[in-house]
């Protein structure tokens, strides 16, 4: 196991961002241990197509577990056969959260996971995180959610 973490992959990030109309250049290094599995949720849900069974199959997920998590997130069974293109933004975000929770990963990275999510589902997501205790790095603006599940909180201000 130790030798696994001695082999690192390096990624260099160089990007630009705008803050108050000013371009800000930033760089950094990211080291990834060989064999490390990461589950990532992006803010973008526009690529979700087809129905949930197809999505589970294409992503090599346990369909029963996937749909069970979606039921905990207040999905009705009738939604299981609908096309994801017709889902609301909140329903699409729930699909990505359920997908991530179905994945066996060393690190879960979620970019604003609670965007468009209703209060009931926020509570359910919080309960699942507290129950399964994944190693989770996320960006979120909901202070109550962060305070309830975080073991360490880093505030970034630009």
Model-flagged regions — what are they?
Residues 144:
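Conserved Rossmann-like nucleotide-cofactor binding loop
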Residues 134-139:
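Conserved H-loop
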Residues 105, 133, 149-151:
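Short, well-ordered alpha-helix to beta-strand connector turns
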Residues 2-66, 90-95, 121-122, 140, 148-158:
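ABC ATPase nucleotide-binding domain signature region
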Residues 126-127, 133:
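A short, noncatalytic alpha-helical element within ATPase nucleotide-binding/catalytic domains
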Residues 83, 109-113, 117-120, 125:
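Walker B catalytic motif
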Residues 42-99, 103-106, 112:
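ABC-family P-loop ATPase nucleotide-binding domains
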């Amino acid at each position: 196991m130790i030798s696994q973490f001695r082999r690192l992959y390096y990624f260099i990030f160089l990007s630009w961002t705008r803050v108050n109309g000013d371009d800000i250049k930033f760089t950094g290094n990211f080291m990834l241990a060989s064999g490390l599995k990461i589950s990532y949720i992006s803010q973008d849900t526009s690529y979700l197509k087809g129905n949930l069974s197809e999505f589970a199959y294409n992503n090599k997920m346990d369909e029963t577990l996937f749909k069970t998590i979606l039921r905990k997130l207040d999905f009705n069974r009738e939604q299981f056969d609908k096309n994801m293109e017709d889902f609301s933004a909140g329903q699409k975000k729930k699909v990505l959260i359920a997908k991530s929770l179905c994945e066996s990963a060393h690190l879960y990275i979620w970019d604003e996971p609670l965007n468009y999510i209703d209060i009931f589902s926020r509570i359910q997501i919080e309960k699942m995180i507290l129950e399964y205790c994944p190693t989770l790095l996320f960006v979120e603006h909901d202070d109550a959610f962060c305070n309830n599940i975080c073991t360490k909180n880093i505030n970034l201000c630009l």
